[in-house]
Amino acid sequence: VLLKKRTSQYDKKFLLEIDSKIILKKFGVPIPKSLITNKSNLKKNNYSINKLKFPTVLKGTGSNHKTENGLVFLNIKSKEELVNIQKKMNKINGDILIEEMIGPISLELLIGITKDETGLFALIIAQGGIYSELFSKAVNSKELIILPASKNSIQKALKSLAIYPIFQGYRGLPKANLKKTIEVIMKISSLIEENDKNFEEIEINPLIITPKNAYAAPRLQARVEATLYSANAR
């Protein structure tokens, strides 16, 4: 996937999850292993499905509110169960995303990058996923860094969060990989810095942290000043 300038009038749009993950993967951001198919071809994709590790998640790709619209099926434990779910997929039209569920989950973060009125980009690191509500009233619920960010500044921001003790394995929870978390946040920041004219905002919620890595479950907001088209990834 490449980004190419376009001279037409600016217009904001949200990219589909599939497109978002293609872009993030190109910049080295880990994403769950996945397969893109559709209802009619689901049974024909046995070879590719066999490469996925169960449990998996099945998602319709055409809506920003997948869970509310019945377009998400979680914790699918076998290929047989996956095929049987076809009978419940009346609301899904178009492509289907099947991806491995990530675990064990140590914690979830929200990573956001937005442009202010002066044209500077600000990196926001906060509690994400289920922790957003749990720590919403905490004093240190989020940290802000003006880009470009360094590894030290990101580490300092993470250590300032109320959620930070979970990185150390709070009360028996699996430890979260701090080093990988910092590396992934740096890669997300690089995406914006290298394409500052194409992207206006990124929000990844959640960034899933495990004992071994950090994975993006993203939604990207881009300007249509940038045209996405398929090409060889670098």
Regions found by a protein language model. Name each.
Residues 1-234:
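ATP-dependent carboxylate/acyl-activation modules
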